[in-house]
UniProtKB/Swiss-Prot annotation:
Family matches, as InterPro entries: CinA-like_C, CinA_C
Pfam families: CinA (PF02464)
Annotated source species: Mycoplasma pneumoniae (strain ATCC 29342 / M129 / Subtype 1)
Source taxon at top rank: Bacteria
Record's protein name: Protein MG115 homolog
Record-stated family: Belongs to the CinA family.
Amino acid sequence: MYARLIAEKLLNHKLTIATAESVTGGLLSSSLTDIAGASRFFKGAIVAYSNELKKSLLNVKQSTLINHGAVSRYCVREMALGLMQKLNVDIAVACSGVAGPDALENQAVGSLFFCVIVANKAYDFETKLPAGSRNELRQLFVQKILQTVEHILSEIS
């Protein structure tokens, strides 16, 4: 539902979007490309599951990973900024989190960090969803991100 609303807003305003994903492993971009006509608003995705790819493809600083970890608001902000630079889009969405089964970097299972950059403004989000199965959490993460992106687009349009 949210992906369709996002698509309508992007198409109406002739905006483009891209995603940089870690914890969702491509599910976020898949949700957007499920919409017919996605090629008119969706530029692409970088699934940077490893820290090496976060650094090399998205320009995440080594110091950020050491000081704050990959599952942090600092990392997803740098991922979103790197995505904007690499893919030259109007809207960049980046996410990282913990889907389990174990905690990671002192973050509990269900922790989600994401950043949305639109109109040169960055919106940072941190949430904790109830623990569930790994795949349930990843789906919930995607829904939370899409809901938030749709809300941001509603506010600015």
